């Protein structure tokens, strides 16, 4: 028995010209189905040193006659370029057939940025139009693209924490959005103290980024994209939301959160989310396979044909 397996490369994904606002819609649509998925915990192996290879499986519910299962394999290996890479294997869950092998790097970045943008939009206090962003590499820019595209109908401001030339490069990347204004802040304490929504895409934080709790004013929403550097907030913020309890429950201060719930319950209307403009809210989104597989399935449906190979499988019982 032979069936065709699509190989979806980065160049094919680029050719789709997917709007970042579409990515925000996709992560919301995926969150809304979270109660109906099967998503076992991530499983990691460590070949050497700090390197890792992690598997992230997820079974999506049936929709319009299709039922997808996928597994994302993500690796961080010292010396590979880029250091962090991922591939997604997408299956037809009804037949068990492998449908596609999808480059996962773009998906990882954009679903991460889209989740942060959706969390900001959902949990920010009323009337906010200013977003303070630090860690302005690829993921930080993905956050900016999603926020800018999702707020096309109004003017917003990005306050950028200066570090090397990252802020200037961020501005250059997003300069074509006519609804976005930019401010570059040099003082770290002022950056935090004046933030209404603080989004950190800092990838490495071996200590607290803002150990002075008084810097976080009432009504602030903090979104640590890589869940690092804000553990002090765990102890005094009014509410904490996470993308998946199985991941967040291992945090050091999980049992000391004042109030905790999964973020998708806010989107479903089961939790009010922000109740007033004084609450300090923390949003932890560790990254879940649900979004990777949802994105891969939508991209597969748009491409399907193209590069690939015929996979020959035994169609009779194998006897030994």
Spans of model-derived segments:
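Short helix-loop-beta connector
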Residues: 123-130, 154, 217-218
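Glycine-rich adenosine-cofactor-binding loop
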Residues: 116, 127-148, 161-166
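NAD(P)-binding Rossmann-fold cofactor-contacting core
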Residues: 150-174
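Generic secondary-structure signature for well-ordered alpha-helical cores
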Residues: 18, 28-37, 121-125, 149-152, ...
């Amino acid at each position: 028995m032979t069936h065709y397996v699509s190989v979806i490369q980065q160049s094919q994904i680029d050719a789709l010209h997917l709007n970042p606002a579409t990515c925000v819609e996709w992560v919301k649509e995926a969150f809304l189905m979270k109660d109906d998925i099967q998503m076992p915990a991530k499983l990691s192996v460590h070949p050497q040193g700090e390197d890792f290879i992690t598997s992230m499986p997820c079974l999506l519910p049936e929709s319009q006659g299709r039922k997808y299962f996928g597994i994302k394999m993500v690796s961080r290996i010292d010396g590979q370029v880029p250091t962090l890479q991922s591939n997604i294997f997408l299956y037809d869950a009804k037949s068990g057939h492998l449908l596609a092998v999808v480059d996962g790097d773009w998906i990882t970045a954009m679903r991460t940025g889209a989740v942060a943008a959706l969390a900001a939009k959902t949990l920010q206090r009323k009337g906010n139009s200013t977003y303070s962003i630090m860690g302005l590499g690829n993921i930080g820019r993905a956050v900016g693209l999603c926020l800018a595209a999702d707020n096309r109908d109004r003017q917003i401001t990005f306050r950028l924490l200066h570090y090397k030339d990252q802020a200037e490069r961020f501005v250059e990347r997003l300069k074509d959005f006519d609804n976005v204004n930019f401010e570059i802040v040099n003082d770290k304490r002022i950056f935090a103290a004046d933030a209404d929504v603080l989004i950190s895409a800092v990838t490495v934080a071996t200590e607290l980024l803002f150990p002075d709790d008084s810097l976080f004013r009432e009504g602030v929403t903090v979104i640590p994209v890589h869940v690092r550097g804000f553990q002090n907030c765990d102890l005094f913020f009014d509410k904490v939301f996470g993308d998946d309890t199985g991941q967040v429950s291992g945090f050091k201060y999980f049992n000391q959160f004042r109030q905790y719930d999964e973020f998708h319950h806010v989107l479903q209307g089961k939790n009010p989310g922000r109740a007033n403009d004084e609450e300090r809210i923390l949003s932890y989104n560790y990254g879940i396979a649900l979004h990777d597989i949802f994105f891969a399935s939508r991209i597969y449906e748009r491409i399907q044909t193209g590069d690939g190979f015929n996979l020959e499988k035994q169609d009779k019982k194998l006897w030994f």
